[in-house]
Amino acid sequence: MRLLDFKRDGADWPLREASRFVAAGGFRWHVQELGQGPPALLIHGTASSTHSWRGLAPLLARDFRVLTFDLPGHAFTTSQRRPDLSLPGMAEALTSLVAKLDFAPRLVVGHSAGAAILARLIAEGRLAPGLFVAINGAFLPFEGFARSVFPAAARLLFVNPFAARLFAWKADRTTVANMLAGMGTKLDPRGLDLYVRLMSNAAHCGGALEMMANWDLSRMPDELARIACPTLLLVGANDRAIRPEDARKVAGRTPKARIEKLQGLGHLAHEEAPERVAAPIREAAVAAGLIGGG
């Protein structure tokens, strides 16, 4: 499958001037770094990339040194070997990256599955942030019938060598817009174009499918209980991918968690209205003593 090429496919990539490539843990990571101040790490969700932070990262960079990257199997991060895209595999890969960069984040922000990766790293003591922010965090396993059906369906698609190509072939503008609408999100034309570009690439689709096929959150409820830092759960009230009411269960298991609901926003809240997401993050960072309140 043809990989995305940064010179060709990323010629107009958001925040391209902040991009570079770093070798760590067997991967060639596409990373972006901008701003000055306490270090902040941002992790996108399944099937996304650094572009997801195009609006929020510059706002946070007013106070923080912000680091974002493409997850293994996604967008412009590549590997010579077949990567382990399970939750433990992702956590191990990220550990190698932050070690290589000598990056010890004080603020960590994760969207959807990216929040679950951060929760695992914090619970295991690999990261020790002063504030953990989850944007529509995907922390809880599917319940009931869906618990076995959805991962099994992803595995069936992944083992079919034509599945990723079929997904990419079908990823026209209307299909991707409908997929995003199904998550309660409507993006501007630029945001939609970027997702069409990603989802039209079979290698990127294959990475997302493999990640879903290998995702196991069965330990997550116990791991949430080991997160000692202040935790802000930002919840899009219109999210149709992660049930907004799940945040109450997550907060009940996480010692220092509080919920802030974002009315009118869906699963990709930080892309829909980055300024509305940046404001509570900054307030929480001030309260946690990470930055001044001026």
Give the role of each language-model region.
Residues 1-40, 61-64, 92, 99-104, ...:
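Alpha/beta-hydrolase fold catalytic core
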Residues 27-76:
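Conserved HGGG/HGGXW glycine-rich cap/lid loop of the alpha/beta-hydrolase fold
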Residues 123, 129-161:
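Flexible "cap/lid" loop of the alpha/beta hydrolase fold
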Residues 144-148, 165-225:
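Conserved alpha/beta-hydrolase catalytic His-Asp/Glu region
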Residues 227, 233-235:
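Short beta-strand/loop motif that positions the catalytic acidic residue
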Residues 265-278:
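Catalytic histidine-centered segment of alpha/beta-hydrolase-like enzymes
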